[in-house]
Amino acid sequence: MSGGEASITGRTAPELNASAAPLDDERELGETVAATALLLAIILVTIVGNSLVIISVFTYRPLRSVQNFFVVSLAVADLTVALFVLPLNVAYRLLNQWLLGSYLCQMWLTCDILCCTSSILNLCVIALDRYWAITDPINYAQKRTIRRVNTMIAAVWALSLVISVPPLLGWNDWPAQFTEDTPCTLTQERLFVVYSSSGSFFIPLIIMSVVYAKIFFATKRRLRERTRKLGTLAVPAPPQRTSSRPLAELESVASQEDETEPSPEPEPLSSRADKPANGISVHQFIEEKQRISLSKERKAARVLGVIMGVFVVCWLPFFLMYAIVPFCTNCAPPSQRVVDFVTWLGYVNSSLNPIIYTIYNKDFRTAFSRLLRCDRRMS
C-alpha cells in the first residue's frame, strides 16, 4: 500500500507526514486563537454587564430599592469572577503550565471557589426573596429592611468563605513540591469534594428548585384567581354604583391585588383628566389594571423557567464532573478539552446573570441605555 501511494503521489510516506505537520500546527493555532478570542469576549461581556448593573442601581433612582441590593451582591460576585479568576485561567490554558508558583496557585483556586460559590448562593437568596415577596407580600414588605437584606448578603459571603477556605488550611491533596510542570488544579480530596460541591451547588440547587416550583404554582393559582375576577369585572356596572372618588383612591383599590408587582407606566395627565368619574370608568380602570397584572405574572412565570434552566445548564456538567471523578478510580479521566469546556460553561453563567435578571426589567434597560449614552439625567 505504501509503495502504491508513493507512485501515485510521487512522494514517500515520511514526506507526507512532514507536509501534514505544518497543517496540524496551523489548525491548532487557529483553534487556539479562536478559543482565546471567545474567552476574552466572555470576560469583557461579564465585566461590562455586571458593572452596568452595579452603577445603575446606585445612580438611577427607580432602581434604588432594598431588594435590588441582592442583585448588586450577585453582580459583585460575578464581577470578581471576571476580574480575578477568568484572566488567569486564560493565561494558564495558553501557556499550558502554571508559572506563578504554589502560593498564587492555591490563592487563585480558593478565589475561584469563593467567587463562584457566592454567585450561586446569591442566586439562591434572590430566589428566596422572590418567594417570600410573592407568598407573604404584606408581612415580608415590613421585614425586608436594609438591615435584614445586608445581613442576608453578609451571610452569603461568609458561607462562601467557609466553603472555599479549608484547602488553604490543609484540607487538600496538593503536592508538597510544586514545579512548573505541576498542574494547578482543584483538590480532589474526597471529603472536601463532597463538602464543597454540596455547599456550593447541590444544596442551593435543591433549594432553588423547590422555591421556584412553589413560586410557579403560586403564580398559576393567582392567575386563575385573577382570571375569575376578570370574569366578574366583565359584568357592566349598574348605574347606582356611580362613583366620584379621586383617581388616586381608585388606583389604590385596583392595586390591592398587585402589591408585589411594579407599577405600570403612568398615563399622561391629559388622558387622566379626560376620564369621566363614573361607575363605568371605574370598572374599566380596575379591569385594565387586572389585565396588566395578569400579563406581568405570565411573564414572571416564563422568566422563572429561563433563570432555572440557564443555571442548571451552566453549572450541572461541571459539578457532576467535579463530584464523580475523584470517586471513579477506574474511569478514564476526562480530556483537557472537556474539562475546559464544562469549566467555562459554568463561568458563562456570570456573564448571563446580568442579562437574565435585567433584560426583563424596563428600569434596568432604561438605566443601561442612559449609561451607554452618557446621559447625565440618571438620578
Swiss-Prot record:
Disulfide bonds join C105-C184. One of its GO terms (molecular function) is octopamine receptor activity. Residues 5-36, 91-107, 172-196, 326-340 are extracellular. This is Probable G-protein coupled receptor No18. Glycans are attached at N17. The chain crosses the membrane at residues 37-58, 69-90, 108-128, 149-171, 197-218, 304-325, 341-362. The keyword Nucleus does not apply. It is found in: Cell membrane. Probable G-protein coupled receptor for an amine. The lineage of its organism: Eukaryota, Metazoa, Ecdysozoa, Arthropoda, Crustacea. It comes from the Eukaryota. Its main location: membrane. Residues 234-276 are annotated as: Disordered. Residues 59-68, 129-148, 219-303, 363-375 are cytoplasmic. CDD domains: 7tmA_tyramine_octopamine_R-like (cd15060). It is a multi-pass membrane protein. It comes from Amphibalanus amphitrite (Striped barnacle). The keyword DNA damage does not apply. Belongs to the G-protein coupled receptor 1 family. PROSITE patterns: G_PROTEIN_RECEP_F1_1 (PS00237), G_PROTEIN_RECEP_F1_2 (PS50262). InterPro entries: GPCR_Rhodpsn (IPR000276), GPCR_Rhodpsn_7TM (IPR017452), Octopmn_rcpt (IPR002002). Pfam families: 7tm_1 (PF00001). Keywords: Cell membrane, Disulfide bond, G-protein coupled receptor, Glycoprotein, Membrane, Receptor, Transducer, Transmembrane, Transmembrane helix.
